Amino acid sequence: MYGNYRPGEYIVVDLKHMPKSIHGDEYLCVFTCLSTRLSESVYLKTRLASEFLDHYKNYCKHIRNKTGNYPKYLHSDNGKEFIEKCTSEFNKQKGIKHTYTSPHSSLQNPVAERINRTLGEGCLALLLCAGLPLMFWVYGIAFFSFVKARSPHKSLSFSNPIAAWNIYNTHRSSIDLYDLRIFGAEGYVLDENSLKNHPKAFRCIYLGPSSTHKGCNFYNLHTKKVIVSRNFVINEQCFPGRVHFPNIYDKYFGPSPPKPNSESISPSLSTTTDANGLEYSSIFDFDSHTIPTSTNLP
């Protein structure tokens, strides 16, 4: 734990501007519990204090329900969304002591700044490898946060934030990795409304486990919308984003190697004779498979 504070009592927060997402969000706000290093990311469309306050209130309620504790300290920079009157009044009403960094001194909030940078770099790596544009950063952040919360942490004696959080969690839940696959992989989602003798699945891009449903998020390549489903099959050897958004992947990793063109491969004709003196003419394709074409009897 961080000092003598119990989980949820000491919170640091930081807000970061991001490119416009597929849902119109432009800001990433990360709340971090210093005792467990467990982070929760929320997405904002503006920097208005009212929008931040709504997410802040929900986070405080979440901590109260999960741990039985209520935040005692909040540490942030001097962003206008943090120092507005409505935020200050809420902190006074709940007895939360809000401390700020000095102007232009982000080093005074090291945990929040480090986590924001880690999430940003991890999200960028996921998007580039999957060949997806930056408008999918919301799902990249959520996926990376999901993995990070279940990975060993040095400050927790190499335990993970979820395990440290569950020690004081009144509603404990085991770590479930059942829906975890490679980000950006090809997925086929069951079409619940398919007709007889019609395709039974949509070809999609896997975007990680859903935080609000018991299922996973997928980007439908046909409708260009994000859907949630629990009935799917994942092909982790294929990444449709590299083809669907070729400029993204090719810019950083170079063009993908060309696929073999079957039309440019000319099969060779070979004649063989068996022990009985019968001649067989066979076509050899590029995979070295033989297809008998004719038989010449004596």
Model-assigned labels for residue ranges:
Residues 1-45, 50-52, 56, 85, ...:
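An active-site-proximal beta-strand-loop segment
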Residues 6-11, 25-30, 35-40, 67-72, ...:
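Core residues of folded domains in eukaryotic genome-function proteins
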Residues 16-18, 34-37, 49, 79-81, ...:
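Conserved beta-strand elements of beta-rich interaction domains across eukaryotes
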Residues 24-26, 42-45, 86-89, 102-103, ...:
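Short coil/turn segments at secondary-structure boundaries
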Residues 41-67, 227, 232-240:
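Active-site beta-loop-alpha junctions of metal-dependent nucleic acid enzymes
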Residues 69-72, 135, 155-166, 175-188, ...:
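Retroelement integrase C-terminal DNA-binding domain
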Residues 76-78, 82-90, 98-122, 135-145:
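RNase H-like two-metal-ion nuclease catalytic core shared by retroviral integrases
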Residues 112-159, 169-172, 176, 203-205, ...:
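Charged alpha-helix within mobile-element recombinases
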